[in-house]
Amino acid sequence: MNAATSITQAPVADVELKQLNEATAQRESATNNPNDSSSIDERPIHSALSESQRSALLAVASFAAAISPASTTTYYPAITTLARDLDVSITQINLSISVYQIFQGLAPTVAAALSDRYGRRPVYLGCLFINIAANLGLARQENYTSLMVLRCLQSSSSSGTVALGQAVMDDLVTSEERGKYMAYLTLGLVMGPALGPLIGGLLSQYLGWRAIFWFLMILGGFFFVLTFTFFRETNRSIVGDGSVPPPKWNRSLVQILRKDKLVPNRESLQKKRIGVNPLASVQILCNKENFIVCMYGALLFGGYASVISIFATQLEERYGYSQVQVGLCYLPFGVGSILSRWTAGKMIDWNFKREAEKQGLKIVKNRQQDLSQYDIEKARLTISFPMIFATCGFVVAYGWLMQYNTHVASVLVIVFLIANVFTGVLIANSALLNDLNPGNGAALGAAMNLTRCLMGAGGVAAVTPLINKIGIGYTATATAGVWLAVLPALYVVYSKGYTWRKAALRSSAQGRGEGSRVASPSP
C-alpha cells in the first residue's frame, strides 16, 4: 500500500510513467498467460553455466553417487568367502546387505536437509570423507559385529551422495531436458551395479575380500579430490543461476585459482532456507501423488535389487562359475542401463515436447516452463507404461531361464533387456517427481532413496528364502505379478494427477486470498 501511494503522489515524468505501465502490463501478461511465447521469452535463464559445464557437474555428481551402489555390488562376489572367513551363514551376510540398504534409505534425509541450508559442495565433501574412514575400518575388521556396524557407517556416508545428485540436477536442468540429463545422473547409479561385481570378483579371488574395501577407500579418496578441485556450488539460494560467487570457503580449487567471468545476477538467488529440516523428505511423501509415484518406483526397485543380489549365487550354484566369471556376467546390467540414455532418455524428452505442443506449452531452451497448467503426468507416464510391461515380461523370462539352467547366453541377453527398460522406467519416474516438486531436489532425492532402499532391503531379505521354497521361476513370476497388481495405482496418477494438482492450486490460491483479507488492517 505504501509503495502504491508514493507512486501515485510523486510527480512522475511521462516517459517514466509509460515505462512503468509497460512493465506492469508485461507482468500481468506473464501472470495471466504463463505459456504465452512472449512471457516465456521474458523469463530469466535457468542456468548461466554452459551445457558443457552443466554436463561436467552432473558427471561428477553421477560418479560420486556411484559409490553407494558400488559399495553394495562389489560385495556380492565375496558373499560366500566372507561367510566362510567370518564363520557365519550366507543368510547373515545377506542380512548385512539389507541393513546396508535400510541405512542407505534413512541417511540421505539428513544430507539433503544440510545441503539445502549450507550447500551441496560441503555436504558432498563431508560424506566422502566419512566414507573413506568407514572403508578403512572395514578393510581391517575381524568379526561379524564390526562388519555390520561399519557397513552401516559406510552406507550412511555414501548414500547421501545419491540425494545430492538429484538436488544438483534440479539446480541446473529444466523440465524439457530432464530425460537426457536424468540419464547422465542415473549412469553412476547403474555403473556401480554393473562394474562393482566384476571388480569385486577380481579383487576377492586374487587379493582377498579385504582388497574390496581398500579399493573403495581409494575410490572415495579419488572422488574427494575430484569434488574438492572441480565441483562448484550449485545451490540456488547460494549461487542463484550459477553466476553469483559463493563464500570463499565454499569455492572449488579451480574457482579459487581462476576467476569466474560470469556477471553476478543476484536477482536469481532463491530465498535461503532457515534451519535444517530432516523431515522435508517425509513431508514430500505426504502428498498423495508423490506418495503413489514414489512407492511404485520403490516397488520396482525392490524387485530389481533382488534380481541383482541373487544373480551371483545363482551363477555359482547353477553354472559353477568363479568369482571373476560372475563379475563378468554382471556387465550386461551396466551396458543395458547405459544405453537407456539413448533409448529411454531420448523418448522421454521427445514425448515431453510432443505433449507440450498438443497442450499449447511453448518450449524455450534453458527457461523453466510453468507446469501448473500442463498435464505433466501424461507426458511422463505415457512412456512408462509400456516399459513397465516389458520389464515384467523380461523378469519372468529371466526366472524361468534360470530355473531350467538354459545356456547362460540367453540369461545374459535377458538381464541386458531388464536393465535397459528398467532404467528407462526409473528415469521417467524420477523426471515426473522432479517436475512435481520444483526447487526441492535434495529432499525429493532423499524421499526416493528412502522408499527405494527400504523396499530394496525387503526384497533382498525375502528373495533367498522364497527361492529356496518355491524356486526362482515362480519367484520371478510372483515379482512381476506384484508389479502388475499395483500398476492401476499409477494409472490413477496418469488420469487424475493433473486434476488433483489444479484442485490443490485453487485451494492454495483461495487460502492466500482469505489470509490476505484477514491480515489486512482495518481502515
Curated annotation (Swiss-Prot):
Gene Ontology terms: biological process: export across plasma membrane; xenobiotic transport
Transmembrane regions: 183-203, 211-231, 291-311, 319-339, 381-401, 408-428, 443-463, 470-490
Record keyword Membrane present: yes
Subcellular location: Membrane
Gene Ontology molecular function, alphabetical: transmembrane transporter activity
Region forming the signal peptide: none
Keyword Transmembrane helix attached: yes
Pfam family, one: MFS_1
Protein origin, superkingdom: Eukaryota
Keywords of this entry: Glycoprotein, Membrane, Transmembrane, Transmembrane helix, Transport
Glycosites: N35, N94, N143, N235, N250
Location, primary (coarse class): membrane
Skewed-composition ranges (Polar residues): 21-38
Region (Disordered): 19-42
Bilayer topology term: Multi-pass membrane protein
Cellular component aspect of the GO annotation: plasma membrane
Family membership: Belongs to the major facilitator superfamily.
Function: MFS-type transporter; part of the gene cluster that mediates the biosynthesis of squalestatin S1 (SQS1, also known as zaragozic acid A), a heavily oxidized fungal polyketide that offers potent cholesterol lowering activity by targeting squalene synthase (SS).
Name of protein: MFS-type transporter R5
Lineage, highest ranks first: Eukaryota, Fungi, Dikarya, Ascomycota, Pezizomycotina
Gene name in the database record: R5
